[in-house]
């Protein structure tokens, strides 16, 4: 099986359409379909900050849950939206406010439909996907070699948030260790979460979050070809979001 793994979309629907078309997908049915049966995989954070979060929920639900032709691994923004939909007490900030604004503008029956679809998508998707006979792992923020196969709280925190130190940058975002430098496994780890100006290959890991929602690009990794394909963002460039990885 061949995969096209998509970086953090964050509601950037137009960029997602442009990228999938560049990858050879046809949208005539209203969904991206590849003539060679390549499958899409999403590294999470499909919502928040961008303009079309709810449409992205519908598309990914349709591909992953209804048609079962794609893979989705949730990100930290997905986890927070899930908790919001469950009625938990979450802070409506850091991008969630854009998704909530879209949601609250809907009539109640459409709200219920979106909520049910996202809850189903989240609950029926694993923390990470192991594909191609363990040669490939798709997740949100990365995973240590010794965590592969585990699902406990410590691993969940790492996979959703990265290797956080507990310290904060001046803008309140967490300081993260560069776990990829220490990774010695042979399974390819494809992930996103931390915006980088160019796809970042380190050992057998690839960060494909090139900051579409911050005016960078939306990037896919073609597997097993190990080629990256990108399209430019239509949004304003926010340089401070592309912080060097320490």
Swiss-Prot record:
| CDD domains membership | MPP_Prp_like (cd07423)
Q: Which Gene3D superfamilies match?
A: 3.60.21.10
* Gene Ontology molecular-function annotations: bis(5'-nucleosyl)-tetraphosphatase (asymmetrical) activity; GTP binding; nickel cation binding; phosphatase activity
Pfam families per the UniProt record, alphabetical: Metallophos (PF00149)
The Swiss-Prot or TrEMBL record lists the needed cofactor(s) as:
Ni(2+)
Which keywords has UniProt assigned to this entry?
A: GTP-binding, Hydrolase, Nickel, Nucleotide-binding
Which reactions are catalysed by this chain? P(1),P(4)-bis(5'-guanosyl) tetraphosphate + H2O = GMP + GTP + 2 H(+)
Known EC number = 3.6.1.17
Q: Which domain of life is it from?
A: Bacteria
The record's annotation in SUPFAM superfamilies points to: Metallo-dependent phosphatases
Gene Ontology cellular-component terms listed: cytoplasm
Quote the HAMAP family the UniProt record gives: PrpE
What job does the chain carry out?
Asymmetrically hydrolyzes Ap4p to yield AMP and ATP.
Q: Which family does it belong to?
A: Belongs to the PrpE family.
NCBIfam families (UniProt xref): PRK13625.1
Q: What is this protein called?
A: Bis(5'-nucleosyl)-tetraphosphatase PrpE [asymmetrical]
